[in-house]
Amino acid sequence: MARYTGPKSRIARKFGEGIFGADKVLSKKNYPPGQHGNNRRRKTSEYGVMLAEKQKAKYTYGVLEKQFRNLFEKAASANGITGEILLQSLEARLDNVVFRLGIAPTRAAARQLVSHKHITVDGKVVNIPSFSVKPGQIVGVRERSKSLEVIANSLAGFNHSKYPWLEWDESSKVGKLLHIPERADIPENIKEHLIVELYSK
């Protein structure tokens, strides 16, 4: 399955929430897309509910099925609560950390910045969006990229105290992952236990 590149409002309406951020269309059309969307609210099977939750997580973090499955398998083999570890692994992805630091306005934009070699980790360019950032590592903007309009606009007025597991130095345009976030601190509306149940079937 390729990464979805179509209208984000369509996906937001599918799940009934703005999984990509604030969505003006969703506030007007809070029902599934399609010709009969306003009349299509129907009971979903147990499997359908679990599958939808997995899709929501994949769309939210912009992860493909193979990557998502690999992250789940690693989480399942680790000590701790599988669903929480899965979300923590998604939060540790470099593209997500770039987004959380306010360097990019969306995760999709963050992926582009990483892929186009605008982002550094501990001073070295890393162009792999799925790179897992470890606590203590420094994520920054490459010197020649600091004047990019998309970065400047995204950082302007961004509240860097939103996420207590991250630290930001405005003067040098670098951030640090202080620690892996607790589940209660992760703001995404994802029922990870349903994903665990789906993969356990």
Swiss-Prot record:
<dbReference type="Pfam" id="PF00163">
    <property type="entry name" value="Ribosomal_S4"/>
</dbReference>
<comment type="function">
    <text>One of the primary rRNA binding proteins, it binds directly to 16S rRNA where it nucleates assembly of the body of the 30S subunit.</text>
</comment>
<dbReference type="InterPro" id="IPR002942">
    <property type="entry name" value="S4_RNA-bd"/>
</dbReference>
<feature type="domain" description="S4 RNA-binding">
    <location>
        <begin position="92"/>
        <end position="155"/>
    </location>
</feature>
<keyword id="KW-0689">Ribosomal protein</keyword>
<keyword id="KW-0699">rRNA-binding</keyword>
<dbReference type="InterPro" id="IPR005709">
    <property type="entry name" value="Ribosomal_uS4_bac-type"/>
</dbReference>
<dbReference type="InterPro" id="IPR001912">
    <property type="entry name" value="Ribosomal_uS4_N"/>
</dbReference>
<dbReference type="GO" id="GO:0006412">
    <property type="term" value="P:translation"/>
</dbReference>
<protein>
    <recommendedName>
        <fullName>Small ribosomal subunit protein uS4</fullName>
    </recommendedName>
</protein>
<keyword id="KW-0687">Ribonucleoprotein</keyword>
<dbReference type="GO" id="GO:0042274">
    <property type="term" value="P:ribosomal small subunit biogenesis"/>
</dbReference>
<comment type="subunit">
    <text>Part of the 30S ribosomal subunit. Contacts protein S5. The interaction surface between S4 and S5 is involved in control of translational fidelity.</text>
</comment>
<dbReference type="InterPro" id="IPR018079">
    <property type="entry name" value="Ribosomal_uS4_CS"/>
</dbReference>
<dbReference type="GO" id="GO:0003735">
    <property type="term" value="F:structural constituent of ribosome"/>
</dbReference>
<dbReference type="GO" id="GO:0019843">
    <property type="term" value="F:rRNA binding"/>
</dbReference>
<keyword id="KW-0694">RNA-binding</keyword>
<dbReference type="InterPro" id="IPR022801">
    <property type="entry name" value="Ribosomal_uS4"/>
</dbReference>
<dbReference type="Pfam" id="PF01479">
    <property type="entry name" value="S4"/>
</dbReference>
<comment type="function">
    <text>With S5 and S12 plays an important role in translational accuracy.</text>
</comment>
<comment type="similarity">
    <text>Belongs to the universal ribosomal protein uS4 family.</text>
</comment>
<dbReference type="GO" id="GO:0015935">
    <property type="term" value="C:small ribosomal subunit"/>
</dbReference>
<dbReference type="InterPro" id="IPR036986">
    <property type="entry name" value="S4_RNA-bd_sf"/>
</dbReference>
